[in-house]
Amino acid sequence: MNDTITAIATPNINSAISIIRISGPNTYEIVSKITKKEITKTGYTFVKEFIYQNDLIIDEVIILKYVAPKSFTGEDLIEINCHGGVLITNKILDLILESGARLAENGEFTKRAFLNNKLTLRQANSINNLIFSKTDIATNLSSNGIINSNNDFFLDIKEKIFYLIGKIEVNIDYPEYEDVEQVTAKEFNLEVKEIIDKLNKTINDFNKVSYLYNGLNVVIVGKPNVGKSSLLNSLIKKNKAIVSDIKGTTRDLVTESINLEGLLLNFIDTAGIRESKNKIENIGIKKTMASIKEADLILFLIDDSKKIDKKEKEILNLIKNKNYIIVKNKSDLKVNANSELKGISISALKKDVKPLVNEIKTNLKQGDFNIANNLAICSDNELKIIKQVLLVLKKSYANSLSGFPLDLLVEDLKVAYEKICTIMGLSEDLNIIDKMFKNFCLGK
């Protein structure tokens, strides 16, 4: 990190103000060049100066000064607040680059903050989650990850693995000492199995509540022409899907997202499930079946003005082990032909969907919010690493059960240990760190 980086930190659009961020050892020297005035690290924390291109003034800006280590990145850092035209902002950026800085990579400012111990990896990931949050709930969870950055869960896992590695290596290096406690295969298996169980639980917890970050996938299924597209349009209050009396008009999956009291719901209207000789329609039906498997919640829509038929009973059987709500459409006709089925009555045509919205809210488990607030994993990046750790430990556990000597298994433990250290920000493996920060914003 001996070079100086720069990037536009605000959207590259015409606006009132733009911010250009510069960080690194030559920050003050570079800004002094483009202002034709020495910008010192002492004095006021912000100054008003002109930016020059040769001898021509191109903008009057506010310069915010941060001196290492008291900055976001832990380095000398300056933020130039200029007028927000795209042309002028990029002109100033070009001047900074010509004066010795290089364009930052995605997430490089945050990566430097992490490498300079200004942030934990958990805090860095939570900041990225916060930037991309689409609901109040996701924002609150991300903020919680920034504030509560402890690594207690991973510290416990790390220490257990380190303890095992240490005992095995002592046994290998000093077999002649009888007073050194010997690690048995039974002890090894118990310890590793305990770690595997803990990792499985935290992965399951993350998967259970990931919808709070990414949104709940709500799939609308039913026979053709029962009002699925009308229901979708009523829920999202737009005319998104094709509404027609012709069967099979929704041949592909139609997706729209809404913010329901702080929770993101991704509604998917699917092709009607029926026997069809139309190849294109059959593709849509296959996609519907795939969506059902991935759905967090299924809205099974029926026409309640007539009894459900054989095909609808097959659909009901298909989703019986999923999280679903039976939605009885056409309540305005007041027939209620399927009174034996427990469901929510609505009229998609009259946009009377409030009872369904209330049921969806009730369907969400309050306990999930408690799990989310105490998650050990806070990002997909961490999830990927934990899965890698789990894979290595499962391999080691299986090999131990098969009779492998422990000295052959210690290398697997070292791999797992290093990956846990990566999550905690203790790893020197910069390749992994680079990959994690590539998903961040430019200028962040």
From Swiss-Prot:
Family annotation (InterPro entries): G_TrmE, GTP-bd, GTP-bd_TrmE_N, GTPase_MnmE, MnmE_dom2, MnmE_helical, P-loop_NTPase, Small_GTP-bd
Tagged with keyword Hydrolase: yes
GO cellular component, as recorded: cytosol
Binding site for GTP: 225-230, 244-250, 269-272
Keyword annotations: Cytoplasm, GTP-binding, Hydrolase, Magnesium, Metal-binding, Nucleotide-binding, Potassium, tRNA processing
Cofactor note: Binds 1 potassium ion per subunit.
Coiled-coil segments: none
Binding of K(+), residues: 225, 244, 246, 249
Chief place where the protein resides: cytoplasm
EC annotation from Swiss-Prot or TrEMBL: 3.6.-.-
GO molecular function, one term: GTP binding
Subcellular localization, as worded in the UniProt entry: Cytoplasm
Chain sites annotated for binding (6S)-5-formyl-5,6,7,8-tetrahydrofolate: 21, 79, 118, 444
Matches recorded under CDD domains: trmE, TrmE_N
TrmE-type G domain sequence ranges: 215-365
Enzyme class (EC, first level): hydrolase
Cofactor(s) listed in the protein's UniProt record: K(+)
Subunit structure and binding partners: Homodimer. Heterotetramer of two MnmE and two MnmG subunits.
Function according to Swiss-Prot or TrEMBL: Exhibits a very high intrinsic GTPase hydrolysis rate. Involved in the addition of a carboxymethylaminomethyl (cmnm) group at the wobble position (U34) of certain tRNAs, forming tRNA-cmnm(5)s(2)U34.
Protein name: tRNA modification GTPase MnmE
